[in-house]
């Protein structure tokens, strides 16, 4: 491990030199590439330097115990050794995690797609609950949420809602939300008080930049149509809504949230790029994972990942067996307990795979 850490520190120092080179400074692509690489390894280098400093202090403290010391001084040095050993262990564990290969998409913005699935109107209402949950979580994180496309129901739910969350680390936190979310509750329209079970699916896609996925104009068919509101009625007499079809993959995206056709096309292209990128990413990940089973699902949209039980005010994540009796707070966006546990489980899996 120490050899790998030293190599990372050497690379960090080399990047410092490169970023001071006038030739690099004048090349915006290289400057961006090297700056990102340096930023990605900065925390590892800082923790490694702290680790080396603690080890040096520990070595000196243990050497002092070899000297002739009075009882009081010896006790003080022993306490210092104990404290330094604890620090060394903590830093060593942090370094093991930092050395685990990082998902290159973790720092990206995300496009989230929530759809009502089994359960009709109740599923659509639950899709709305999930959208508000993620919006509130994003707000707490200081991220910005923007609706790209929404298909409403007459009761105020969503057949489908697609929205973007802009914020560093959004994908790292939200990628584990991929899958089928199940809700158990008594619908307001249920006079007999029977509990109904409905589901909504969530897809979390990392935003893809143009440099990462090259979509040629000739490969995209553009169709325009009049926007429609709840119930299918026309709300716009101009052809402002846009449907994009990526011919090589068959991926289709529609957007009618904006009054301007140009803005709808821009939003639709963001989603199209993300979906095509995600399709290739999923295929590559499936090939990588075929020889090992992952404990935390991040891609299978059909996987039932979580149950929200209203009568018992509890939420259970089935992947890690975690149940929390705070459903009301979770729907207000307080997702940290689940997200932190899922991140830790993923890190453990990655560490195991790297060994």
Curated annotation (Swiss-Prot):
Methylated by PrmC. Methylation increases the termination efficiency of RF1. One of its GO terms (molecular function) is translation release factor activity, codon specific. The modification N5-methylglutamine is found at residue 233. It is found in: Cytoplasm. GO terms for cellular component: cytoplasm. Keywords: Cytoplasm, Methylation, Protein biosynthesis. Belongs to the prokaryotic/mitochondrial release factor family. Peptide chain release factor 1 directs the termination of translation in response to the peptide chain termination codons UAG and UAA. PANTHER family: LD18447P. HAMAP family: Rel_fac_1 (MF_00093). This is Peptide chain release factor 1. It comes from Bacillus anthracis. The lineage of its organism: Bacteria, Bacillati, Bacillota, Bacilli, Bacillales.
């Amino acid at each position: 491990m120490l050899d790998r850490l030293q190599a990372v520190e050497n690379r960090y120092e080399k990047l410092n030199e490169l970023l001071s080179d006038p030739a690099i400074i004048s090349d915006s692509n290289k400057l961006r590439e090297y700056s990102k690489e340096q930023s990605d390894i900065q925390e590892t280098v800082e923790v490694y330097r702290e680790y080396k400093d603690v080890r040096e202090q520990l070595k000196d403290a243990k050497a002092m115990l070899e000297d002739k010391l009075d009882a009081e001084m010896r006790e003080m040095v022993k306490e210092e050794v104990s404290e330094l050993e604890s620090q060394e262990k903590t830093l060593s564990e942090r370094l093991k995690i930092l050395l685990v290969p990082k998902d290159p998409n973790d720092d990206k913005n995300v496009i989230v797609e929530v759809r009502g699935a089994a359960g009709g109107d109740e599923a659509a209402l639950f899709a709305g609950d999930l959208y508000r949950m993620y919006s509130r979580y994003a707000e707490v994180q200081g991220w910005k949420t923007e609706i790209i496309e929404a298909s409403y129901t007459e009761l105020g739910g969503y057949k489908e809602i697609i929205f973007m969350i802009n914020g560093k680390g959004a994908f790292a936190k939200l990628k584990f939300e991929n899958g089928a979310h199940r809700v158990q509750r008594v619908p307001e329209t249920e006079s007999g008080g029977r509990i109904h079970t409905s589901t909504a699916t969530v897809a979390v896609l990392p935003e893809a930049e143009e440099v990462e996925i090259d979509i040629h104009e000739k490969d995209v068919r553009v169709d325009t149509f009049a926007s429609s509101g709840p119930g299918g009625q026309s709300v716009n007499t101009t052809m402002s809504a846009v449907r994009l079809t990526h011919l090589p993959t068959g991926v289709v995206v529609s957007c009618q949230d904006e009054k301007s056709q140009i803005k709808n096309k821009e939003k639709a292209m963001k989603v199209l790029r993300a979906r095509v990128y995600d399709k290739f990413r999923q295929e590559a990940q499936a090939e990588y994972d075929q020889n090992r089973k992952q404990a935390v699902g991040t891609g299978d949209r059909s996987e039932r990942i979580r149950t929200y039980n209203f009568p018992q005010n509890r939420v259970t994540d089935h992947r890690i067996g975690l149940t929390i009796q705070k459903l009301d707070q979770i729907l207000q966006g307080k997702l940290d307990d689940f997200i932190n546990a899922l991140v830790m489980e993923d890190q453990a899996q990655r560490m195991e795979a790297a060994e």
